[in-house]
Structures are given as structure tokens and as C-alpha cells.
Swiss-Prot record:
GO cellular component: cytoplasm
Active-site residue list: 149, 326, 359
Name the UniProt record assigns to this protein: Serine O-succinyltransferase
Residues holding substrate: 218, 360
Subcellular location: Cytoplasm
Organism: Xanthomonas campestris pv. campestris (strain ATCC 33913 / DSM 3586 / NCPPB 528 / LMG 568 / P 25)
EC number(s) on file: 2.3.1.-, 2.3.1.46
Summary of the function given for this chain in its UniProt record: Transfers a succinyl group from succinyl-CoA to L-serine, forming succinyl-L-serine. In vitro, also has homoserine succinyl transferase activity.
Length: 380
């Protein structure tokens, strides 16, 4: 069991015991975070970033860690999230293996990793932990709360469970509930991990490690993170050089197969499998319809419960952005977020971007996502 904590990571101790939404408690838990910029005297210029499943808190280079971060093009002086103006905080999700307490962390009661004894994790737990970091930094209200992918879910839960915590919100490629397609994909990913004999009921180590299962899970994920349009444009039906092609007729032959294999191998040893299972399942369970005043399903309009849940959020301004080619969190989900927030009284806008990169577009298509984020923050 390994945690992967970047240099310069800071830690916030959560209240102990910490009750979890689905039952169970954590003791001596912590959240990893990093910061950029300077907090104003009135603490009114804070921006919080909550992340997708796999990122750490190192969104960009800073004084504590000059290495480029996972959102380097978006966070920094003069960048769309301008640290000359904003005090930016990025938190690593509770349940992760990148510094926050998760299944790979040591259980203080046993002195051994939690593994599957870690309590069931919900997006709401992730949100509550992030809110505690905000309060600990002396921030009464964020100027803006930004969430991307799973972080879009976390942000909505945070806004709903902690009213008044932010003046504005940017939801990037997020959703207010998990769709059946997304649940199905994540189910296959978890099954691939759990069927690997080296997973061993969660009791693996660095030698006996479920590498094949993690590799398959990552390949499935990468396929859904991009779009058919991008696959066609990047790879077409181009084959590998003959000297790189295995004798096996079912081995790697096309460039796209080689890309998936290389991408998966780079990932598998840098994310804990049990943490992957917990965070993945937390997204399946997330559904803002639970917070609708009337939880009875409307057969004629099943989305009404989600919209009613979103309408419970009180925020002044919001922007929901997505890529039109996203198949994992389809752009209709971001449109739904804007609609629901408007019903709650927000000045909420929706922006669907014609990016070919699918769900991962916010991580690579800065030419489209950067100006949208910059323009929104200019009015905050």
C-alpha cells in the first residue's frame, strides 16, 4: 500500500472523530492541499479548486514545489485563474492516495493500512472535508468554487451542504448525478481490478500487486475520457512499425492500442487500487435528487428531481462548461446544472464547447476552456 504525496503538500487535520455520510467514522484524518497567491486582508479573494478522481493537490508550480502541476496552463500569474489576483487553494479528495486520508493510509487504531476497512466514501464526505479546509484557512466565503469532473460533483455537494460558502461557481465537465452509462463503465473498471488475483480482497503489496486489473481499468477510463473524433484524428488506422509488432496476431498492432497500453502502464503504479475503488463508487452513489424537497419520482420527467435538488443551492453566479464530445459526463449534464441553479435564483450560464478532446478537454484544450474561465472570473 503506497501513498503518492507531492513535495510541498500541506495538511489539514479534520475533526476527530469524523462521521461519514454512509456510516462509520474516521479518526485523525487529514486533507492534503496546496495554495498559490496571497489572501487579501478581508479574505475575500479566495478560489477553491476541487478535482477529478486521480489528481493530487499540485495543480500548478508554486514556491513549495516548482514542478509543473496537472493544471499548469490554467493556474498562475496572468493565467485564467490569475494568482496575482486570487488566493487559490486546491484540495486532494478525501479517500485519495495523494496525501488525504484514504484506504492506503494508516488506520491509527491498528497501525496498518485501512484497505477495505475504510468506511464507505461519498462525494458528500469529500465535500465536507474540503469545506473544513476553507474554514481552517479563515475564509468565510470563497469568491469562486471551481470543480472539474468528479470535482464538479464535489462542488455541488459543497454548495448544497454549506450554504453561503461561495459567491460564484464554475462547474467544468461535472454532473449532478451519475448516469447509467458512467456507472456501467466504472463498474467494469472495478470488476477488472477485483478479478485480478493479486488484488486478493484488497490485501496486495508492491510485489503481489493487481497490475493487470489496474491496467485494464485505466484503459477503459481513457477510452471514455476522449472522443471518437479525437481517436480518428490522432491515430486513424495507422499501424505500428513492423519491428514493434508482436508475433501474436492478437497483440498490439495499431497505434491506438499502443497508446492505451503506454498510458495505462504509466498510471498503474501511481494510484492505489483500493482508493480507485472507493472514489469510483462514490461517484456512482452521487445524486442531487436526494436533496429535492419532494423525492417522489416523476415518471414523466425523471430529471425533475435533479433540477429540484440543484434549485436548493443558493449562489449569485455560476458557469457550467462542457465539451460537446464528452461521453462520460455528457454536455447535457452541464446544461442541466445551469438550468437547476437558475431555478434556485442564480445568474447561471451554460457553455458547450466544440472541443474534440471529450471529457478530458478541460485538461488539454486550454485555447477553449481558458478564455471561458478567465472571462467569468473577471466579473467576480
Amino acid at each position: 500500500m503506497t501513498e503518492f504525496i507531492p513535495t510541498g503538500t500541506r495538511f489539514h487535520a479534520l475533526p476527530s472523530p469524523l462521521p461519514m455520510k454512509r456510516g462509520g467514522v474516521l479518526h485523525q484524518a487529514r486533507v492534503a492541499y496546496e495554495t498559490w497567491g496571497t489572501l487579501d486582508a478581508d479574505h475575500g479573494n479566495a478560489v477553491l479548486i476541487v478535482t477529478g478522481l486521480s489528481p493530487n493537490a499540485h495543480a500548478a508550480a508554486n514556491a513549495d514545489n516548482p514542478e509543473p502541476g496537472w493544471w499548469e496552463a490554467m493556474v498562475g500569474p496572468g493565467k485564467p485563474i490569475d494568482t496575482d489576483r486570487w488566493f487559490v487553494v486546491c484540495v486532494n479528495s478525501l479517500g485519495s492516495c495523494k496525501g488525504s486520508t484514504g484506504p492506503a493510509s494508516i488506520d491509527p487504531a491498528t497501525g496498518a493500512p485501512y484497505r477495505l476497512s475504510f468506511p464507505e466514501l461519498s462525494i458528500e464526505d469529500v465535500a465536507d472535508a474540503a469545506a473544513d479546509v476553507v474554514r481552517a484557512l479563515g475564509i468565510a466565503q470563497l469568491a469562486c468554487l471551481i470543480g472539474n469532473s468528479m470535482g464538479g460533483m464535489t462542488a455541488l455537494a459543497l454548495l448544497l451542504r454549506h450554504p453561503g460558502i461561495a459567491r460564484s461557481h464554475i462547474n467544468i465537465s461535472g454532473s449532478a448525478q451519475a448516469l447509467p452509462f458512467s456507472i456501467a463503465i466504472r463498474s467494469l473498471q472495478r470488476e477488472a481490478i477485483r478479478l485480478d488475483p493479486h488484488w486478493n480482497g484488497g490485501h496486495y503489496d508492491d510485489v503481489q500487486y493487481p497490475e493487470s486489473g489496474m491496467r485494464m481499468a485505466r484503459k477503459l477510463g481513457v477510452i471514455t475520457y476522449r472522443s471518437a473524433l479525437e481517436w480518428d484524428g490522432r491515430f486513424g488506422r495507422v499501424r505500428l512499425d513492423s519491428e514493434l509488432t508482436a508475433e501474436d496476431p492478437f497483440g498490439l498492432e495499431f497505434q491506438v492500442e499502443s497508446y492505451l497500453e503506454g498510458h495505462a502502464r504509466r498510471f498503474v503504479r501511481f494510484f492505489d487500487p483500493n482508493c480507485y475503488l472507493y472514489l469510483s463508487r462514490s461517484m456512482d452513489w452521487f445524486d442531487l435528487a436526494e436533496y429535492a424537497p419532494d423525492t417522489r419520482a416523476d415518471a414523466a420527467a425523471p430529471e425533475s428531481g435533479v433540477l429540484a435538488g440543484l434549485a436548493q443551492i443558493r449562489i449569485a453566479r455560476a458557469l457550467a462548461i462542457g465539451a460537446n464530445t464528452d461521453i462520460l459526463f455528457p454536455v447535457q449534464q452541464q446544461e442541466q446544472i445551469a438550468e437547476g441553479l437558475r431555478a434556485g435564483g442564480a445568474d447561471a450560464q451554460f457553455l458547450g464547447l466544440d472541443s474534440p478532446q471529450g471529457h478530458d478537454a478541460f485538461l488539454v484544450d486550454f485555447a477553449r476552456f481558458g478564455p471561458a474561465v478567465r472571462a467569468f472570473l473577471a466579473d467576480c
